[in-house]
């Protein structure tokens, strides 16, 4: 508000926390989904959820483990077929104690997660995975499974839309892009969405999802930025992401932005945010992310050489300088200088 006042003049800030479609928060343990909060508790973490997690960590329950041992889950079948290798560990021999402790819990494969969501009437869903390779890997997991989320009529309708959307792309290019497998995935009701895809492919996925023909999308966080693709449910597999330098926790702002895709206005009465539990994940931490509504905004604006040259070419030096001085980054920098000056003055008077 203060920044806008300096740029535009007198500004009145109006704060609204009303959400057109209410959002329910959930955690998934094995094949079960538990409410994150106690009903009508004002934000108290679900005691039953905490008890289940404690039992799971102590090895007193087989939630998420029985299917893995018996070979029912998709990841279990992949492990048995692959000679003892799993997605999370190497060969069975020589593993550390920490790795053996994680055997108490095995996350469901992506197809199994979608089946659980389907049984709870939580589709369509967007699963956020913080890498392009992870999104493609999730898609191939579903392809290798027997999962189908569409009827025969819907599958044919999807194929017709896809074929019309790629008309004009040479056949040899489609072969390089693995078009047939991508088309099959769409016809079965699931897709990947990330910036590494051909723009035409991304637009087709967005169109089919908005039409309700594709029921599951595995996407990077770029889908939460400016693309109108709301879903009934948003799934977060992890609460950490790689920021280019290190793996860091999601901030409340990022969590709110991602889960903000849940709940379609005029269609759903409730949206769902589902976090998949993993060892060492504290439900109170998740509750903190879900309940935080105010968080600092920090500008990431950083002028570069190309921007400077373009501004000078279009506006000249004086006008370019005035424009940059109006930026939120400059406003925050000025504020920090004022605060540091006050600190120095207070220190001098001591």
Which residue stretches match the model-derived regions?
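Conserved C-terminal RecA-like helicase domain
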Residues: 69-97, 105, 111, 132-216, ...
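Ser/Thr-glycine-rich phosphate-binding loops at phosphate-binding pockets of nucleotides
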Residues: 1, 212, 218-223
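Conserved segment of the helicase C-terminal RecA-like domain
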Residues: 24-25, 216, 222, 229-294
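Active-site glycine-centered loops adjacent to acidic/histidine catalytic or metal-binding residues
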Residues: 131, 190, 226, 260
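Long, largely alpha-helical accessory region at the distal end of helicase-like NTP-driven motors
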Residues: 281-350
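Conserved interdomain linker/interface between the two RecA-like ATPase lobes of SF2 helicase motors
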Residues: 1-141, 191, 277-281
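Conserved ATPase-coupling elements of RecA-like P-loop NTPase cores
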Residues: 1, 201, 227-230, 245
């Amino acid at each position: 508000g203060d920044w806008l006042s300096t740029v535009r003049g007198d500004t009145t800030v109006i704060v609204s926390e009303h959400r057109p479609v209410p959002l329910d928060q959930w955690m998934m343990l094995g094949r079960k989904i538990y409410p994150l909060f106690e009903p009508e508790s004002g934000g108290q973490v679900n005691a039953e959820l905490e008890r289940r997690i404690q039992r799971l960590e102590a090895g007193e329950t087989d939630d998420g483990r029985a299917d893995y041992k018996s070979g029912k889950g998709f990841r279990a079948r992949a492990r048995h077929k692959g000679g003892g290798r799993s997605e999370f560990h190497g060969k069975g021999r020589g593993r550390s104690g920490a790795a053996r402790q994680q055997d108490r819990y095995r996350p469901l494969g992506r197809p199994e997660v979608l089946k659980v969501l389907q049984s709870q009437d939580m589709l369509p869903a967007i699963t956020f995975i913080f890498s392009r390779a992870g999104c493609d890997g999730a898609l191939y997991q579903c392809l290798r499974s027997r999962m189908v989320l569409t009827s025969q009529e819907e599958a044919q309708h999807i194929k017709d839309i896809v074929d019309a959307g790629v008309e004009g792309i040479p056949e040899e290019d489609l072969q390089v892009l693995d078009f047939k497998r991508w088309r099959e995935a769409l016809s079965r009701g699931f897709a990947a969405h990330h910036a590494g895809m051909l723009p035409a492919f991304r637009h087709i996925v967005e169109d089919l999802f908005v039409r309700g023909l594709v029921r599951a999308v595995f996407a990077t966080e770029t889908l939460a930025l400016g693309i109108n693709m709301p879903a009934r449910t948003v799934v977060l597999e992890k609460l950490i992401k790689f920021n280019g330098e290190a793996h860091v926790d999601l901030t409340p702002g990022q969590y709110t932005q991602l889960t903000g895709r849940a709940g379609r206005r005029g269609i759903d009465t409730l949206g769902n945010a589902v976090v998949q539990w993993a060892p060492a994940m504290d439900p109170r931490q998740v509750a903190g992310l879900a309940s935080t509504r105010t968080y600092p905004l920090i500008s990431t604006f950083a002028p570069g050489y190309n921007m400077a040259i373009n501004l000078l070419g279009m506006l000249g030096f004086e006008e370019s300088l005035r424009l940059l001085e109006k930026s939120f980054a400059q406003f925050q920098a000025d504020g920090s200088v004022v605060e540091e000056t006050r600190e120095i003055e207070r220190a001098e008077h001591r």
